[in-house]
């Protein structure tokens, strides 16, 4: 009986999805980290940023991983120019006049911390069938600048 219980315990632990935190360092020393990389649909993950250039506004979102050299799109929540919701964020310490109050300012040292909701579908795209990630990219004021792009792939479990 003990062997059977031990076998059941080993099997149940081995079948549990592994969900570790992950981080990535960008070319300019910025660090992006996420609390979990394997989640269930509708889960919320914590995303931290450190050492980001406070003169460059960024978007933080859950997006389809793009082809090399392209901006991440589509993204859950779209490009958040309304400053509302938990699917995407516009982070900028020096937003244009029309965006004052819509952006979240960097904390000292180019830091930020946000909760991002993960959805299986981004529009009609199924993130169980294509690769999706927590992403950071330069905001629309530098829309062609790919030097700030960072991606941490996220798996949506069944």
Show which residues each predicted segment covers.
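C-terminal segment of classical bacterial N-terminal signal peptides
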Residues: 13-20
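Extended, solvent-exposed regions of the mature portions of secreted/cell-surface glycoproteins
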Residues: 22-158
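Sec-dependent N-terminal signal peptides
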Residues: 4-13
